[in-house]
Amino acid sequence: MAYSYTEKKRIRKDFSKLPDVMDVPYLLAIQLDSYREFLQAGATKEQFRDIGLHAAFKSVFPIISYSGNAALEYVGYRLGEPAFDVKECVLRGVTFAVPLRVKVRLIIFDRESSNKAIKDIKEQEVYMGEIPLMTENGTFIINGTERVIVSQLHRSPGVFFDHDRGKTHSSGKLLYSARIIPYRGSWLDFEFDPKDCVFVRIDRRRKLPASVLLRALGYSTEEILNAFYATNVFHIKGETLNLELVPQRLRGEVASIDIKDGSGKVIVEQGRRITARHINQLEKAGVTQLEVPFDYLIGRTIAKAIVHPATGEIIAECNTELTLDLLAKVAKAQVVRIETLYTNDIDCGPFISDTLKIDNTSNQLEALVEIYRMMRPGEPPTKEAAETLFGNLFFSAERYDLSAVGRMKFNRRIGRTEIEGPGVLSKEDIIDVLKTLVDIRNGKGIVDDIDHLGNRRVRCVGEMAENQFRVGLVRVERAVKERLSMAESEGLMPQDLINAKPVAAAIKEFFGSSQLSQFMDQNNPLSEITHKRRVSALGPGGLTRERAGFEVRDVHPTHYGRVCPIETPEGPNIGLINSLATYARTNKYGFLESPYRVVKDSLVTDEIVFLSAIEEADHVIAQASATLNEKGQLVDELVAVRHLNEFTVKAPEDVTLMDVSPKQVVSVAASLIPFLEHDDANRALMGSNMQRQAVPTLRADKPLVGTGMERNVARDSGVCVVARRGGVIDSVDASRVVVRVADDEVETGEAGVDIYNLTKYTRSNQNTCINQRPLVSKGDVVARGDILADGPSTDMGELALGQNMRVAFMPWNGFNFEDSICLSERVVQEDRFTTIHIQELTCVARDTKLGPEEITADIPNVGEAALNKLDEAGIVYVGAEVQAGDILVGKVTPKGETQLTPEEKLLRAIFGEKASDVKDTSLRVPTGTKGTVIDVQVFTRDGVERDSRALSIEKMQLDQIRKDLNEEFRIVEGATFERLRAALVGAKAEGGPALKKGTEITDDYLDGLERGQWFKLRMADDALNEQLEKAQAYISDRRQLLDDKFEDKKRKLQQGDDLAPGVLKIVKVYLAIKRRIQPGDKMAGRHGNKGVVSVIMPVEDMPHDANGTPVDIVLNPLGVPSRMNVGQILETHLGLAAKGLGEKINRMLEEQRKVAELRKFLHEIYNEIGGREENLDELGDNEILALAKNLRGGVPMATPVFDGAKEREIKAMLKLADLPESGQMRLFDGRTGNQFERPTTVGYMYMLKLNHLVDDKMHARSTGSYSLVTQQPLGGKAQFGGQRFGEMEVWALEAYGAAYTLQEMLTVKSDDVNGRTKMYKNIVDGDHRMEAGMPESFNVLIKEIRSLGIDIELETE
């Protein structure tokens, strides 16, 4: 394989044994593809597919007026250009969006004509609000903050059959039910009650007999019975009663008479149970008629009404039970044929027949009225109203939609072959659902598993945005209908009819405040990616935490390869919020699919198919790690497989599919944990979750022991700068990279230059620091897709969340008791876990009733010293180091005029004293914060004069833009002249500056000319002259284009900012805070091994090895066995080997060994100890040297999950590094120099510093605010609150009998207002006594008791 620019600089030793059949897909595809389909940006009218915005418009339009004389049709839409780019939106706090313009056509029909002749057509583009755009990393910028829309896992539309698991009725009888769930519209439930009648509920309202619904659909009793039952036909001839025999129906019954064949031979004796053998004999004998006694009919149900042959009068209605009296009437009327329902107790119960018996309605109208009463209780029903209501419930496309998914699931479940059909229900649909339900009750068929991923689908961003958009459009539709009637008479245009506010409001509400629109977790690249790949069962139309039971949260066999079984939050959301598996994707119906390799006759092919949970059920699927021979055939006699959602073993020839990769089971975060296979699942869960909380360190450090997924995550997360096109690095500095694009990648008319501006010290959503550092040097050749700059937590294009620390597992003076961590001072000195946090502080100047607030350096009653960090505009300098209480932005607010004494008035008149009528409301640094000002932004309202600071910031930004554009022009111009030089040198000239006719042009001549003079040359070859003219035109066009671009940017910068009403100016100050690691900070490994730093010891006191190398961290070995995360020990061993190999390479470099020796040693590391072979021969000597230099700190290893390094390989690596194979060494106590009594496990573990810093939690209150009602101090760090002295603490003091301390706690230290002030006065006077009074909260209690109407008085002595 060819290595990329960064890969060949540092190759990871890969221990995987299985080949890569398929690359890991782009990890953000689920977000980007979904929203791309929703917008269909760039599609022409003909190319629009029936999805997304287009589908939403088509479902609501055309809108026809109430009279039918005017209609508004939808033609198409187009998206405009965004006003600001992403970075500008974040700065200005606006939404990154594009205007949506819809072309609609207003048609007015001629009222007089009979055939609706068209009288007038008007077409117009209407503005329909703004649609947020997705950034290239799958996020949205809403009001300046980056947000993610999480995908939702919800119950798929369709029909589901279930039972109550015996919970409803005390007998434990299973009550079956069916539920038709549409995509939008009313739910329809059918359910059995304990008496085996079928009921129907609409939208979970009160139940009605199911036959009411069938009657309302227009079925008569007889048609209903015909649909559900077969009939037995009896012929009456005089005194004999003959049954038309269907032998199968007799099975299981007891013969009430002897059953004989045609010859009179008895087949079944009276009183015997009829078995399958008897039935076979009857079929062979060809018995078609069976004589039965008349009482055989008693208790049977009539299937067709019995009519008097002579008079035509109805003797018995259908669905009536036959009794003796009825039989007598039948005999008297000489009826010759009776049809009864065939029912039995085993597999054909009389459920529908029983339901009809309890049904009080007898015709369609009564049934419709009954349904109307249930849906609209209290309203008087009319025939029309009842019909309209029922028609709208399930049969109107506007109110009811199963959607394509719903129809597909519906048809599949009830056994139809076609998967497409209408979105509304039909009579047949309802009958078929009832038939299936009755079959399941009869024991034919099974109920559905609601947690099966074939019954749950994923709703992505695009689909949810489309639904919201439709909601907005439906609101618009109502208003448009009202106005259309006016349009006929008043000649309105489409623009006057459509008010886009409801649409804009619906979209804004969805992106701004929906439960699934979340503030992006931007701690580090992994947390971003995981957030975008999250799948939540909560949210609108989903579950709620309280109602979700264990089953929904549990891991289901169908999760395999679709949803990660490991990564989910701990706590109330466990199992409801999941993460997509590495290779999973959604299909067109929204079901999750996983890829598999096709296996034919035990030969594994490279053909890959994606299957959903339903499609894979019948396949026999082998694991990715199944043993294959050289030809790719399965060799084991029995292969471990998955079949019908069970794990089992099968012969190789039965296998039909095979997993693509061992990591397809887990999510991205879990696939980053090396030796995951050796960790307990609970700890792996914590490990996956804690990696997302790692704070990016000052200098990222790649993990020595990784899994090979680090590069994918860093590349796909979007925090690195990736080359859009290949080329040569023209210039590079800390803030940008300029690439001169290779000629073969430049398309005509495009500039052959790419400028990448790097993000420097920017604040993330979590206040961590986003900073990019270039990796390339001037003159380097890069290809498309190479990584040009590292972002936060990335090191040479690999994810690097923490630091490699030398750890020893040993108890140490109790400092690492219970997961505490003992750190060496060296870690702090080397800034290994130093992180930068950026805080944004905002100062807003408003227009108040008494006058405008002013931002100024002239602040009353403030000394010079406090102002020395402010400029003349009153804003702090960039680079100032500030601490708590320092003024960042000086601001004064006018305060109300006070009554002045005559003397004051006189002084005021003489000295022009103005200071007393404003108060100081400056922005100060909050308590507990100290840092450096790294940036200031000033936003000024239109029409308000800009201050000097705002103007200087604007000038700086313009200079930067101008610099970029000049650079671009310089490169384009340079490339053009290079091409011209190649064409001109050696060609003959006709004329030119200081040139004779016919002279050959040389390099020296061209160098002597100014570039503008080149175009004055006249060549003998006309093609060359044409080339010169084209080049001149091209250069001037580019210049013009860039000037226009500059003017556009300048206009944007100089226009006023769109601020909230009443706001004149906003100043944002950004503080960078450096946080070193300190006791109380939380740290963790990748295996769920978390702990808190308890002590930082001097280096000389730490345990060290025989060479004197001290360890960085001492961990407690007791944290391993009970937690069963042995992965951390294996990681430590392999880390030791990796570091040892690096040191060996370092020694070779220091001894200046030959490159061949180095190459040989690298070959030993990479290609002789298991795992994947690396092709080192394609690297030149210089590249080998560069690689060796990068490996000095340790040879990075990859041990992919479920396919990682084996114990023997770790030992071999340790041996190669000349280290003990046990991974243990003798350590010495740094304080005494004595050797510890047994060898200790020492190695390198990758440790993370989590975003739970003691600085953010530690807090102490001095004098602060009090609660208004209880007069007690507030609680919490944010309110500068006190410590709660709670109920249990009071008990403790009571138990000790510390009465005075307790009294002090409950009165003067809390809410005794008078006592507090008195105590303050006493202390000032040097008197340290206290007098306790009445606590305020006691007065509140008395007031509350009085409010209950109980008079309570305190007796005074």
From Swiss-Prot:
Reaction(s) catalysed by this chain, per the record, are: RNA(n) + a ribonucleoside 5'-triphosphate = RNA(n+1) + diphosphate
Could you list this entry's UniProt keywords, alphabetically sorted.
DNA-directed RNA polymerase, Nucleotidyltransferase, Transcription, Transferase
> What's the superkingdom here?
Bacteria
**Which Gene Ontology terms describe the biological processes this protein takes part in?**
DNA-templated transcription
Cellular component terms, GO, for this chain's entry? DNA-directed RNA polymerase complex
Entries under PROSITE patterns matching the protein: RNA_POL_BETA
EC number(s) recorded for this UniProt protein? 2.7.7.6
Check the record and name the CDD domains matching this protein: RNA_pol_B_RPB2 (cd00653)
Molecular function terms from GO: DNA binding; DNA-directed RNA polymerase activity; ribonucleoside binding
The family database entries (Pfam families) matched by this protein are listed as: RNA_pol_Rpb2_1, RNA_pol_Rpb2_2, RNA_pol_Rpb2_3, RNA_pol_Rpb2_45, RNA_pol_Rpb2_6, RNA_pol_Rpb2_7
Can you state the subunit structure given in the record?
A: The RNAP catalytic core consists of 2 alpha, 1 beta, 1 beta' and 1 omega subunit. When a sigma factor is associated with the core the holoenzyme is formed, which can initiate transcription.
Similarity-based family: Belongs to the RNA polymerase beta chain family.
Described function: DNA-dependent RNA polymerase catalyzes the transcription of DNA into RNA using the four ribonucleoside triphosphates as substrates.
Name listed for the protein in its UniProt record: DNA-directed RNA polymerase subunit beta
**Species of the source:** Pseudomonas paraeruginosa (strain DSM 24068 / PA7) (Pseudomonas aeruginosa (strain PA7))
